[in-house]
Structures are given as C-alpha cells and as structure tokens.
C-alpha cells in the first residue's frame, strides 16, 4: 500500500497566536492537506521574532479549523519528556478529532546547541533518544501500560481503563532527520520521515534510500512510509515578486547553517550543490544588516540551487512535480513573504488543482 501525495504548509511558532491561526484557516480554505507547525526556539529572536510553544498553538488551531490535518513538525524530546509529549498529543486528539493529527519528533540541532545537549562526552545520541521516545509515546497513546527503563528515559503509567474518555485512534509518528542513522530509524520505527529546510530533490532521493533501507531491515513495506520535505516557497503572478519571500527565508536558513549547525548540514548543502564559502556572505550580511540584507546576498544562482517552490503558479507547479518525481510524498511548503494568506489563496486557485 502506497501513501497518497499531499501538499501542506509549514510555519514556525514564532509569530503571534492570532496571526498563525489565521494562516492555518487560510490554508484550509485554499485546500491544502496539512498545516504543519515547527517549534521555533529563542535563536529566532536574532531575526525579530519570538519563540512560542507549538503544541499550545496547534491545539488552538485544531479547535478553530474543521478539515485540515494538523502536524507537529517537529517538537523535541530534549525539551519534553515522552510522557508529557503523549499527554499533549491527547489534547490534540481532543481538539482535532481522529485522523487530523500527525506527531513529528526531532532532535533540533540548534536547540540542542542552546541547551548543551549532544555535546562531546554525552553517553547517548539522538537516535537512542528518538527510539525510546517513540517506544513510550506509542504505547501510552495506544492505552497500554508502561514500565520503561531505557538508557535515557524512565517512564511508568498504568493501562488506560475502558471507561476513560480518550481516543484509541492510532497517531502517525514521524522523525525529523538529516543524517542517515535517524533517517533509517524513521524507516524502522516510525510512519515517516520529515526532512529539514533547504531540502532539494537530490536530498529527497538520498533520504528515500535511507528511509527504505530502515524499513526493509525492520521487515516493513517501504512504499507505506511517508516522506515529507520542508521546502521554502512563495508565489505571485509576477515571477520575480513570487521569489522574494523564498529568497528571504532561504537567507535565514542558510545563515543558520553557517552559524549554528555546520557539519550536520553538510549533506543538505552538498545535495544542493552549495559550498560554505558560497553562502558565508549571507551569514555576514545577516549579522550586519538583518534578514532583509541577507536576502539581498542570496543570488539567483543560489536560489536556483535551493530549488525553492517559488515564482509564478506555473513555476511552482513545475517544482512541485520535480519533488514528487524524486520521491517526496508530502510537500511541506514554507510560505514566506508579504501577505502569506493571499499567497495561500493563489496556491489554492492556481497550483493545487494540478495535483488532485
């Protein structure tokens, strides 16, 4: 059984609640399949934003929408114990209803750096943390008893009684991953894989190989696994105006990769055909003049290498098809730029019908 091809929108939890809810509602009206919320961390203050709890925001979104699926894309078990993650997932099930919630877990390299996790000398890496988190969360959400003594986490909970008012529906769990170890873990232990920003079609092909290898090792059917790719994007009837938002978001992410997660990001940049020396001026511009100045440092050639879903509706359709053909089954479009609600509407009118 293969998974359906879906197109959704991803935003970061770094803007006021009302604004994020309005965007989710606009995406629902436009016909997008999923609204993902990635948890922003205090690093985004450098760009004039404030970090907020994505789990709190998504519960509000779920209660104020009707059809669109809501996804955590991602939250980190370095910030929440798996038992707490399961408790917050219960709230999402209550607010959204069965079948409207996807649970994404990831290490978040930038946050690990901020809180000192994953440093040299630590006993266990992200793969152990993710595996144990999935073990605990999945059993609790299924209503089972937990008596868990892992390398990282300890957890104890009795089984859910029949009379308890709680959903028994299965919640799909995803792992956000850039490297091969976690990508294979997504194949063996999760329902799907979510890739990081600056994903390109070549990176999708790379991730698909690792995801399917993990699935085969676990005796699972590779075609049943979902592969989501976070791709910066923007749209306008005018091609150049349609690329402005994607250019600015690409600038913020590329600067982040230079400043915070060099090393782990190499494979992303390699698959995009980018060198650190090529994008270092973007980070310099960010430090000196902020995100608008950094956007000016993103050349047309760099934006082309990033393979953003940006420009006119026809250009966006062409790029989405490229990702689909590379093996991406879940487009996570990170819309940025002026009037994102209108951009979502234009995607709904002129792009989404081509993929239905």
Predicted regions and their residues:
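Alpha-helix-loop-beta-strand connector modules within alpha/beta enzyme cores
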Residues: 48-71, 129, 133-136, 140, ...
């Amino acid at each position: 059984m293969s998974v359906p091809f879906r197109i959704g929108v991803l935003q970061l939890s770094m803007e006021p609640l009302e604004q994020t809810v309005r965007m989710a509602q606009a995406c629902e009206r436009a016909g997008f399949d999923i609204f993902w919320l990635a948890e922003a961390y205090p690093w985004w203050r450098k760009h004039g934003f404030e970090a907020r709890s994505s789990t709190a925001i998504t519960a509000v979104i779920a209660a104020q929408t009707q059809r669109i699926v809501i996804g955590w894309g991602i939250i980190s078990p370095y910030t929440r114990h798996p038992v707490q993650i399961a408790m917050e997932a219960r709230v999402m099930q209550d607010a959204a209803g069965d079948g409207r919630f996807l649970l994404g877990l990831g290490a978040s390299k930038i946050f690990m750096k901020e809180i000192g996790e994953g440093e040299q000398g630590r006993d266990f890496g992200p793969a152990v943390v993710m595996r144990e988190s999935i073990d605990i969360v999945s059993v609790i959400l299924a209503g089972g008893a937990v008596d868990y003594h892992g390398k990282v986490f300890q957890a104890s909970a009795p089984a859910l009684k029949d009379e308890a008012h709680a959903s028994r529906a299965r919640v799909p769990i995803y792992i956000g991953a850039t490297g091969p170890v976690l990508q294979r873990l997504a194949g063996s232990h999760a329902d799907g894989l979510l890739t990081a920003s600056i994903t390109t079609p070549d990176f999708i092909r790379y991730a698909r190989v690792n995801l399917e290898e993990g699935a085969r090792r676990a005796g699972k059917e590779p075609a049943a696994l979902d592969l989501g790719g976070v791709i910066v994007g923007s749209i306008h009837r005018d091609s150049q105006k349609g690329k402005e938002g994607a250019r600015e978001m690409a600038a913020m992410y590329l600067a982040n990769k230079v400043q915070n997660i060099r090393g782990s990001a190499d494979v992303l940049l390699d698959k995009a055909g980018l060198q650190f020396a090529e994008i270092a001026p973007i980070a310099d511009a960010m430090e000196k003049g902020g995100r608008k100045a950094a956007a000016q440092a993103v050349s047309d050639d760099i934006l082309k290498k990033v393979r953003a879903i940006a420009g006119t509706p026809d250009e966006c359709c062409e790029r989405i098809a490229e990702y689909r053909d590379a093996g991406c089954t879940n487009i996570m479009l990170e819309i940025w730029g002026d009037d994102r609600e209108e951009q979502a509407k234009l995607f709904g009118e002129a792009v989404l019908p081509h993929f239905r």
